[in-house]
């Protein structure tokens, strides 16, 4: 049986103190760093972390979900970001980046192709605006998989084109592994890229990536499991 990293987070939320003993973060200095990193962002779904604790951990902001909790995702107490949280982060000088992911695995958003892209882009745009996100800021659409080229061409391309049709090319970000980022760049899809390492060559960072997720499920901040991301370009989709 395969267990995804999000299943691990779900287990951690249900069994506090069992997972992550000894990895509660007071500093992110031990996290891997991409060459040329301009700072660290956290991403998380299992709760809401006060700005003061994010700053104390050494991060400059957070990548936050503008998507609903999926069925069975009651543990995702941090989805979607709310206006009060966004005000806490921005009011304390922290950066916010919006990302969207509703389904996963067999229910992954991109599997629905073009029609799903329209649906999810509209919902992401609504939740982004409700949290105070400006109409100029991008939203990273998630390809949280290691897809084949056939899947990319037949489902991911129409999915991302639909995102662009709803929020615009300049506002469409892509969260994906390095090969999917490469395909998207070659096809002129997306303006911002956030790399994850599932299916990416070890130690490789795509030159087009604005952000790189370098650590998952290894630490907590404020009692919430976090992933660690390195900022690679001065403009990475931040809106606060």
Curated annotation (Swiss-Prot):
Optimum pH is 8.0 for the hydrolysis of p-nitrophenyl butyrate. It catalyses: Hydrolysis of (1->4)-beta-linkages between N-acetylmuramic acid and N-acetyl-D-glucosamine residues in a peptidoglycan and between N-acetyl-D-glucosamine residues in chitodextrins. Predicted to be exported by the Tat system. The position of the signal peptide cleavage has not been experimentally proven. It comes from the Bacteria. One of its GO terms (cellular component) is extracellular region. One of its GO terms (biological process) is cell wall organization. One of its GO terms (molecular function) is lysozyme activity. Its main location: secreted. It is found in: Secreted. The keyword Acetylation does not apply. Its EC number is 3.2.1.17. Disulfide bonds: none annotated. Optimum temperature is 38 degrees Celsius for the hydrolysis of p-nitrophenyl butyrate. Disruption phenotype: Cells lacking this gene display an increase in susceptibility to some beta-lactam antibiotics and, despite slower growth in vitro, enhanced virulence in both cellular and murine models of tuberculosis. No detectable difference in the lipid profiles. Residues 1-33 form the signal peptide. Pfam families: Rv2525c_GlyHyd-like. Pathway: Cell wall degradation; peptidoglycan degradation. May function as a peptidoglycan hydrolase with glycosidase activity. In vitro, displays esterase activity toward p-nitrophenyl esters of various acyl chain length (C4 to C16), with a preference for p-nitrophenyl butyrate (C4). This is Putative peptidoglycan hydrolase Rv2525c.
């Amino acid at each position: 049986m395969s267990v995804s990293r999000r299943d691990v987070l779900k287990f951690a939320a249900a069994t506090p103190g069992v997972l992550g003993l000894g990895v509660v973060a007071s500093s992110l200095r031990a996290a891997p760093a991409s060459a040329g990193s301009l700072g660290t962002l956290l991403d998380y779904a299992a709760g809401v972390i006060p700005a003061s604790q994010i700053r104390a951990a050494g991060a400059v902001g957070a990548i936050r979900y503008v998507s609903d909790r999926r069925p069975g995702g009651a543990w995702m107490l941090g989805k979607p970001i709310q206006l009060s949280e966004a005000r806490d982060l921005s009011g304390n000088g922290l950066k916010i980046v919006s990302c969207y992911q509703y389904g996963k695995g067999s229910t992954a958003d991109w599997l629905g192709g073009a029609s799903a892209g329209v649906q999810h882009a509209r919902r992401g745009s609504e939740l982004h605006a409700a949290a105070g996100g400006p109409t100029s800021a991008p939203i990273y659409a998630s390809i949280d998989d290691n897809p084949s080229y056939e899947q990319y061409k037949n489902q991911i391309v129409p999915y991302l084109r639909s995102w662009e049709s709803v929020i615009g090319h300049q506002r469409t970000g892509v969260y994906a592994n390095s090969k999917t980022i490469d395909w998207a760049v070659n096809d002129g899809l997306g303006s911002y890229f956030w790399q994850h390492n599932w299916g990416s060559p070890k130690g490789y960072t795509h030159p087009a990536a604005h952000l790189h997720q370098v650590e998952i499920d290894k630490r907590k901040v404020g009692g919430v499991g976090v992933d660690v991301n390195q900022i690679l370009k001065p403009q990475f989709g931040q809106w606060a």
